[in-house]
Amino acid sequence: MQVTDGCTLVIDTSYGSTVGVVGHEPIVETDSRTHVEKLQVNIARAMDAAGLGPADIGCIVVGVGPAPFTGLRAGLVTAKALAFATGARLIGQNILDPQDAMLRAALRGDAVIADAAGFLADVSHTAQNGQADGRPEPEHHITLCVNDARRKQLYFSLNHEAGVTGSETDSCHWIAMDIDYPGHIVERVNAEVRRRAEIGGMRYIVDVVGHGAARYADAWQSLDALGSVVEGSILDAGAAGLAMFAEMALKHADDEAPVEPLYLRRPDAEVPSPLKHVLNHAGAQRAD
């Protein structure tokens, strides 16, 4: 991980907006109608509260979604402009993978993140279930990470802890980031979890976390083995959540990779299909 001089500023507009300097409490706006207008003001407020100025920024971590177009674009444009003006390092971070890291910290009983995020209070620490003969059954928690996509859809990914299947290089995604309706997400998750359980002989518990998790709580009841349902984001967890989000971005940063938004949803405006060709019709001919 590259060491960055100066402070680290986090800007995310994947759901409302969150702005903060690592080591300090972030400023969170939940009103999606006004968060874009307040973004630059809140950046100035966050820097002032930390006793810092633009010249002190060494790194900017910006959320790249997945999220709806307008708000996400505003955050990316602002972060890129600020990085250009200050010479700060710019790193993009998706919003879904840190949700998994946050929930795993809560399952381990991490007091720092649990105390910072009241919405994690009901998350039970990892426990083992018994088999019929009394022997403990291997059990692992996997995370259905979600973010509200509006239109009754969710952005989501199905994450597991790398190495759980015996390979430290195993991807943390069992289902890569996508957008879908909650009912269909449940079908896809159940199918993948059953397939993995047959291969590994383990029992998997699915925890659901992110903005939109509570809204579709009824849908999650159809998951084969439902754990906790947590309505909240890592960026709702105060200074501790902000630091975890930035730490994850820095740990996995690729300075050669472009920082671009993850929209996932196809645009509403599409190129129209060509007109159907009419048999034996070559178009109107100009008369001589």
Where are these regions (language model features)?
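N-terminal beta-alpha supersecondary unit
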Residues: 1-66
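Surface "functional belts" at beta-alpha junctions
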Residues: 28, 89-236, 268, 283-286
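Short glycine/threonine-rich catalytic loop with a Thr-x-Gly-x-Asp
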Residues: 32-36, 70, 233-240
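Phosphate-handling active-site elements
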Residues: 51-55, 83-94, 111-112, 254
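DPxDG-like acidic metal-binding loop motif
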Residues: 59-95
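Acyltransferase
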Residues: 214, 228-288
